Amino acid sequence: MHKYTLTFRSILAVGFIFICTAVGWFILGGALTHRSMDRSGSLMYEVQATWGPQLRQAHPIAWYESPANASGRSSVSPSMSRVQVDLQYEPKRKGLFWYRTYQVQFAANYEIPNPTPIAQTVYVAFSLPSADASYNNFTFELEGAGVDEPILREGTITQAVVIPPQSTVPLQVSYHARGLNHWEYDLNGASRVQNFQLAMQTDFESVNFPGGTASPTDRSEVATGGWDLIWDYPDVIGAQSIGMDMPKVLNPGPIASRISFFAPLSLLFFFAVLLIFGAVTGINLHPMNYFFLAAGCFAFQLLFAYTVDLMPIHLCFFLSAAVSLLLVCGYLHAVGGRALTRIALPAQFAYMVLFSYSFFFDGLSGLTIAIGAVLTLAVLMRATAKMDWSTVFVARKRVLAGGDR
């Protein structure tokens, strides 16, 4: 076992090694960010072109000509709406990004009314969610007398029908489409919605409603996984739109870059523990030992960054962590024996592995840093409470006089 005297110069040398390693991590994180962001735009375009864009289905609108109105028409809302939506989540991966793609089966039955005491030619318009999406098994059936052929113009189907006074005609619409990120049903800012019900079924358990949309009035969990959600509006004024965000996925690129950017903080804690416990136990390491330890820690993020797009992200993370732990702890065991390994192994596992793994969960990295810092402070305060710090930093002349180099 090799022992070295702890001096102020050796601490400066360790600090220089730390700074150089931190610069390396920043370069690695920047390269990962550039690698991810440089292709994200083109990959997003490819996904939208091959799979489909975000889908926003609008509530149908209807009107009849009314010369008495300033606009020349009077709007009517469906007197009854029964909408069924089935969402199937199928994320797709391209490069270092997962894209939250899904399939939707849409089916709706509406009743289009004529609220006047005379027969009216009512025009019904149904807008498709996006002009860039494809719609399989599409049906649009408007029953009634004098129905013209539907006209498709700029993503909106318009059809006219003659409705007897104080009567309704049924409208049926259904299709199968594919979309990205979230699905939404827009009520077109209707001031009043009556006899409306939307039933949504998902095959995923993590549900999140986009900002500005309403929560369901009823929900029940499906035994096979997923939810049955219902929005029931018997008579609502100012009803909000209805939407569903697809579950979040772990994107390897952003996670790998964040781990690299925050790795210097982990190394700072790790080096602090080794320096202080070295002063307590008398097992002080040479700055060159710290150089190899920094390289072993750097190997974790380096391996993770360049294998994360080749294998599942969790498997890649734990394999990279295992390699780094083996390098660092194996080296310390060879240098300082079991006494040093018993200190370094839990420290590296806590600061490097657990802290890095917290980036897999939103909002936990800051809490992990705070808890780790407080626990580290408590352990170091207890370990050094009875230590005579005046004997730790030895003057250079005394070192040379004693012959301990």
Regions found by a protein language model. Name each.
Residues 10-28:
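Hydrophobic membrane-insertion alpha-helices, especially the h-region
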Residues 42, 49, 63, 71-236:
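Soluble non-transmembrane domains of integral membrane proteins
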Residues 238-267, 285-287:
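Cytosolic-side membrane-insertion boundary helix
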Residues 7, 248-258, 311, 335, ...:
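Juxtamembrane loop-transmembrane helix junctions in multi-pass integral membrane proteins
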Residues 267-405:
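Generic detector of multi-pass transmembrane helix bundles and their immediately adjacent loops
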Residues 1-9:
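N-terminal positive-inside, membrane-proximal cytosolic segments immediately preceding the first
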Residues 58-61:
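Extracellular/secretory-pathway and virion-surface proteins
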Residues 28-54:
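Alpha-helical transmembrane signal-anchor/signal-peptide segments
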